Structures are given as structure tokens and as C-alpha cells.
Amino acid sequence: MEFSAKQIAEYIQGIIVGDENATVHTFAKIEEGVPGAISFLSNPKYTHYIYDTQSTIVLVNKDFVPEQEVKATLIKVDNAYESLAKLLTLYEMSKPKKTGIDPLAYVAPTAKLGKDVYIAPFACVGDGAEIGDNTSLHPHATVGSHAKVGNNCTLYPHATIYHDCLVGNHCTLHAGCVIGADGFGFAPSPEGYEKIPQIGIAIIEDNVEIGANTCVDRATMGATIVHKGVKLDNLIQIAHNVEVGSHTVMASQVGIAGSTKVGEWCMFGGQVGLAGHIKIGDKVGIGAQAGVPGNVKSNEQILGTPAIDAKNFMKSSAVYKKLPEIYTTLNAMQKEIEELKKQLNK
């Protein structure tokens, strides 16, 4: 498909600087631009590429002022990255979508399927399970008995939803992610550890995206809940009875222990670890590899292990870098003091 700068600008409410009739048919990074491609510039580190890019159209923020001639047609918008997302979404929606049940898929006789669903080869839908309209199950995706998946969802290969668990509308579950596996519950006894049956469920609300090989365990009792708009990267562990607030985002390898409650609009860097049975407030930012042993109030920014206020951590880090120099200075001072003591005692 081909679109003109004028059509694109109207769709994203942008202002054209250049040829409104310039046309594009593909996307490209600004540093890899080719004729007929549309690119974007939002990070100042990439500004120098705009003067040499071969892309036909470039999305830029409204405050961008070129320092030299730009050959590409510019479309100025409030947020270039956000506008790119809208265009990419439109592009994805324009792709043909498969529907129907492949002969090699298994759908239980008691399962309920919505309109225009796609069940790929070797996908499985269990007894009493429900699949909403326009939802796609890719090869080997599994929806367990009496589980429910909403409308406009995509389950990529080997995504698994265990029995009785609930997934809302407009959700994306990437390859290998698991919703509703047993929580890590074992009771110690003289003979070892006895398994505690996990009789709860996991609930994934609307507009959630879950990365590859991420696990959201079912609750011991009640529900593990991932609220609306949450975005989880690959390789994340959400333990039993955890609750993740709306629109929170987490980078890869985050681990959250059981029964911890995370607020709304939080941002966690990679490899953050949260202890169990704690509460994290709203709009909390936690830097990569931080270990959080206790409650965190709303709007705090923390770093380190154990995690502390981010500004204090940075100050401590600056001192830490100087420890060898400080040690040398202290050692020299100690020797001077010992010499002074000897002289005073003569």
C-alpha cells in the first residue's frame, strides 16, 4: 500500500514541511532510510542522520528546527514516537488476517468460539473454554478447560492459559508465556516439603501485553491479577496472589514474590526483584537490578540493593568510585597520626 504525505499528515494531525504529494510504501530507521520509506526522529542523538537519510518522509517533533538543508519531506507532530506507533498499528491492521479452525487444531465440543477466530494447527481449546471474536491462536497455543479469552486477542506459539483463568480483550500473549501455572507453595514438614494445592486463578485484564516466556502464576486462593494496560517484557515472573496495577510496565527478568501489590503507572527496570507481601505505591520508578525488601511510597524513585532513594544512591555510587583513593588517603593519615603519637610520647 502507498500513502502520500498529505494522507499521513491528516491521519496523525501533522504539519507538512516539503512535498505533500511525496509517497511512501514502507518503514525504515532514519539511519537506514531508503527512497519510498517513512522514518521518524524523536531522540536527539539521531539528529545528524536526518541530513543524509534517503527516506522520503520523516516524522519529527514540532519543536525540531533543522540546522541545514533536509531533503526529506518532514511531518511535524506533537510526539513523533507516538505518531509512529499509530502508523505502525494501522499498517499491522491492514495485513490480511486468517480466520477459521485448522483441521489439525483441537477444539473441545463444549468450547465456545466467537466470530472470525483463528485456531492454528496443533492449537488446543479445552472443555468449556471461551474464545472471543477476532482472536487468534497460533500453533501449539493452549487455552485450558473453562478458561476465557476476550475479543481481539493474539496468542502466539506455545502461549498457555491454564484452566479457569481469564484473559480480557485486546491482549497479546507472546510465545511461551504461561498464565495460571501453580504458584510456588510448599509447606515444610519433617519429611520434606508438601505441595500446597493452588486453587485460585490468574486474571489478565484488557489491553495487556505479555512477553515471551513470562509467567503469571495462579493464586493459592483468590486471584493473581494483572490490571488493564500493563506491559510485561520477556522472562518475567509474577508469583501467586500478586496484583499489578493498571498501566505499569516492567522490563525483562523482573521477579515479584507472592502476595506483593504493585500500584498503577509504575516503571521497573530489568532484573528488579521484589520481596513478598509488600506494597509498592503508584508511579514508582525502580532502576535495573534493584532489590526491594519493603514497602515503597507513591512517586518514589529508587535504585540499588537494598533499594534506596535514587538521588542518595547516585551520591553513594560517586563515593564508591573514590573508595581506593579514600583508602589510600586514610592509610597515609593513619601513618602520620602514628608518627605524631611517637613524637609526643618521647
Swiss-Prot record:
Pathway: Bacterial outer membrane biogenesis; LPS lipid A biosynthesis. One of its GO terms (molecular function) is N-acyltransferase activity. One of its GO terms (cellular component) is membrane. SUPFAM superfamilies: Trimeric LpxA-like enzymes (SSF51161). GO terms for biological process: lipid A biosynthetic process. The active site is at H240 (proton acceptor). It comes from the Bacteria. CDD domains: LbH_LpxD. Its EC number is 2.3.1.191. It is an enzyme of class 2 (transferase). Pfam families: Hexapep, LpxD. Keywords: Acyltransferase, Lipid A biosynthesis, Lipid biosynthesis, Lipid metabolism, Repeat, Transferase. NCBIfam families: lipid_A_lpxD, PRK00892.1. Belongs to the transferase hexapeptide repeat family. LpxD subfamily. Homotrimer. PANTHER family: UDP-3-O-ACYLGLUCOSAMINE N-ACYLTRANSFERASE (PTHR43378), UDP-3-O-ACYLGLUCOSAMINE N-ACYLTRANSFERASE 1, MITOCHONDRIAL-RELATED (PTHR43378:SF2). Catalyzes the N-acylation of UDP-3-O-acylglucosamine using 3-hydroxyacyl-ACP as the acyl donor. Is involved in the biosynthesis of lipid A, a phosphorylated glycolipid that anchors the lipopolysaccharide to the outer membrane of the cell. This is UDP-3-O-acylglucosamine N-acyltransferase. It comes from Phocaeicola vulgatus (strain ATCC 8482 / DSM 1447 / JCM 5826 / CCUG 4940 / NBRC 14291 / NCTC 11154).
